[in-house]
Swiss-Prot record:
Gene3D superfamilies: 2.80.10.50. The record marks R64, I65 as: Reactive bond for trypsin. It comes from Enterolobium contortisiliquum. Disulfide bonds join C40-C86, C131-C140. This is Trypsin inhibitor.
Amino acid sequence: KELLDSDGDILRNGGTYYILPALRGKGGGLELAKTGDETCPLNVVQARGETKRGRPAIIWTPPRIAILTPAFYLNIEFQTKDLPACLREYSRLPREEEQHSEVKLAPKEEAAAFGXEKLKPYRDDYKIVYCEGGSDDDSCKDLGISIDDENNRRLVVKDGDPLAVRFVKAHRRG
């Protein structure tokens, strides 16, 4: 079955979307933030304000097909327009830190060695799952939110407590 955006339209391979929480009152869309002593915003976080959409992301899969389904491994890349210069050569990947694996940016050449994500139906929306090393669905783990000491709502590999998401076209008017 095809993946759908918030308008009920089919999610397009290479399309640009805001990734927003499905439930109201749980923060805004996904964006990038500096945490700790970082000089560049490398962490994928949920915007603190519920009305903030976050940063647009391109959702794509290497097979050149138009329509995305839950069967495909996906790449989710934040748009490079207006990104700080320190991020231009970075891609997204989970990285082990403390209790959870945070979703952080790393150099693109390192990213190829890590697993991919899939979008899975979850309640009436979707959840993003991380499949280490591109392994089978049984070993895929949910991506959820963990609040750190600085009140950042970090996206982490947190099996069993997923962030329910929906996708809003970045170019949508109104």
